[in-house]
């Protein structure tokens, strides 16, 4: 998990900075009797939760791109004018470029091309994150006066997980399955086949 990776890096004294595209305003609410009562401040609640979680992990720097949560694919939230899914590509990339130049990371991470399980904002993080990785050193597209001094991170890693391992875990959790569910488990629309994963980290101690 990225949480384990962040905790490990922080424990080793590595400076870790997190950039989050949205505050999760369109997320699901499962632990309230009256979800509508907190819906209007869900972004505020989730930001507080994230800051508390990062403090436990030892991460000191958190920045937001300040877009709105786009909701799950195919929901009305996708059409919101302020949703990250609808963000101007160069504008969003520029916001991240400015933060890369501010924090000057050696390694960047972003979601895989399919956004893990297909969330619109995760897909957009892949697009914008990959573009910003290359754009951070590009003064032609992102001039110094507006975005700061150029910087080129050494590595960009796309975060994903083993589809085969995910299938095994899901089958173990669900026990006996019918034929239709078995087919769904065999070809889930998430993760990557193991042969395409080039970097693995064991974060079990964290």
Tell me the role of every PLM-derived stretch.
Residues 1-103, 131, 138:
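Active-site rim/loop-helix segments in enzyme catalytic domains that contact anionic ligands
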Residues 75-82, 86-206:
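Metal-dependent de-N-acetylase/amidase catalytic core
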């Amino acid at each position: 998990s990225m949480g384990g990776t962040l905790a490990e890096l922080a424990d080793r004294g590595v400076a870790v900075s997190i950039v989050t595209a949205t505050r999760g305003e369109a997320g699901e609410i499962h632990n309230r009797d009256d979800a509508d009562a907190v819906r209007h401040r869900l972004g505020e609640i989730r930001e507080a939760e994230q800051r508390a979680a990062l403090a436990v992990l030892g991460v000191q720097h958190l920045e937001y791109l300040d877009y709105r949560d786009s909701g799950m694919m195919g929901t009305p939230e996708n059409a919101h004018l302020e949703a990250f899914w609808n963000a101007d590509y160069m504008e969003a990339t520029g916001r991240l470029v400015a933060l890369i130049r501010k924090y000057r990371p050696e390694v960047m991470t972003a979601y895989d091309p399919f956004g893990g399980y297909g969330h619109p904002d995760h897909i957009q993080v892949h697009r914008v994150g990959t573009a910003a990785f290359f754009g951070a050193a590009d003064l032609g597209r992102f001039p110094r006066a507006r975005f700061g001094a150029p910087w080129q991170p050494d590595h960009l890693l796309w975060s994903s997980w083993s589809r085969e391992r995910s299938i095994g875990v899901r089958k173990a959790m669900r026990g006996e399955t019918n034929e239709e569910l078995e087919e769904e488990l065999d070809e889930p629309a998430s993760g990557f086949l193991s042969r395409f994963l080039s970097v693995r980290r064991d974060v079990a101690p964290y």
